[in-house]
Amino acid sequence: MSAGSGRIPLWVVATIAGLGVITVVGIFFYGAYAGLGSSI
């Protein structure tokens, strides 16, 4: 693997993307669950 070209390592991109997806999905499900709980 060549580490030239100054690009961000793929594992860093994958980690940040994974954390972002988990955070967004978690907030979405928490918001939906809280909304359902308050409406019932």
Swiss-Prot record:
A Pfam family in this protein? PsbJ
Query: What PANTHER family does the database record attribute to this sequence?
Result: PHOTOSYSTEM II REACTION CENTER PROTEIN J
Keyword annotations = Membrane, Photosynthesis, Photosystem II, Reaction center, Thylakoid, Transmembrane, Transmembrane helix
Q: What is this protein called?
A: Photosystem II reaction center protein J
What subcellular locations does the record give? Cellular thylakoid membrane
Q: Which family does it belong to?
A: Belongs to the PsbJ family.
The UniProt function text for this chain reads: One of the components of the core complex of photosystem II (PSII). PSII is a light-driven water:plastoquinone oxidoreductase that uses light energy to abstract electrons from H(2)O, generating O(2) and a proton gradient subsequently used for ATP formation. It consists of a core antenna complex that captures photons, and an electron transfer chain that converts photonic excitation into a charge separation.
